[in-house]
Amino acid sequence: PAAQEPAAVAAAAAPSDSGRPAPKGAAVVSAARPWQPPPIRGQISAQYLSVNGRDSLTSDLTQPAFYVRLDGHNLGGSPLGLLLDARTRMTTTQPVGGTVSTQDNVTRVYLGALLYNAPGSSLRLTLGRQYSPVISSVSYFDGLLAEVVKAGWSVGVLGGLQPDPATLKFSTDIQEGGLYFQLHNRPASTTNWSFTLGGIGSYTQGQPNREFAFLQGTYNSRALSLFAVQELDFYRGDKAALGEPPVSPTNSLVNLSLRVTDAVTLSAGFDDRRNVRLYRDIVTPLTQFDDAFRTGAWGGAAVLVARRLRFGADVHSTLKDPTTQGNIYSAYFSTDRFSPLHLNIRARSSRYDNNQMAGWLHSGTLGVSPTPWVQVEANVGTRNDERSTSSLGLNHVTWYGASVDLSVARAWFLNFSFTREDGTIGKNDQAYGMITFRF
């Protein structure tokens, strides 16, 4: 809602809308100013992770971390803005059986850029550490992105340097440049869609590091949601001399969701991307399992009953990697804000069978939100290998834990969680806390 100024009481006569002086002592209400968003929005977060090993295989670890994100536009009424996403952490590890701990201090800047976009202008400039929100194939780079954005189309050109892939520190080893052209829906359209075509080239000491073209499409309506990207790599120079074909399709990703009726939804997808950068505050056996079997093709269906109960099943086939080729069959159930306590229940059961291993994974979560600003969850899970070619043998692991989320005054957010893991190849207790201020 629009913020209003308090009414001002005039001690003397003041002009009224009719032009006549208002009676002495009459209240004059000043005009309400339209609400304006603050020029800079963002969040500041402090986090702490502790892992305590309870066997001879797991090291102890402590990791305090700090995170800041800023997003500013039209600073001081100017066409300038800024983006900042920086994270720092200090990791202390106590090796198993060791008396000397090791410490690793890391500070990484994921975004650090100046923006230029004059009101009413179609030209947008971004200078600094960034990634392209339009081109999913482009990772971080230090340089300039120039875009012209019109009602039904846009075009962009970028150039700069790739940071060190391991540390994200500034580096001049790899130079990068590219361009794209995009057709998209007009602002008043009820359906969001886009089609993007472009090419990117990166070079090391004048030699090709990677050259590729890409096609990317998105479509979102009430019934259909689609995201698809296909990259096409070109090989020449040293890579061609090593026997690579001149042109090769690489890095395909498709995500499709079709709402057949209000109660039935179908989903399908395909992912053979080689490298995906993942961000995890907490790693559990469940996230490790899903990350390990990310690639492949999948399809499934979900049914909504009584607007609160969701039942679903899917099958995931890992087709590309012969070492993990096989299938994962999953069934799941969930509820959303069920009963006056706003119960949230999620349960999942997965059967996996591939060239390396076979077994079962089960997990469940029970959450309750007694108030809009408090949420409490408890979780439990187990994974049991029936067959494995790993040198560590069969993996049998169980885990359970709890978390609490608190929201204070719509600006402060607190999260606390604890997880205990008991497995044949590792036992540990994991505690995590976070406090975030949003403005």
Cite the ranges covered by each PLM segment.
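Gram-negative and organellar
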Residues: A3-F439
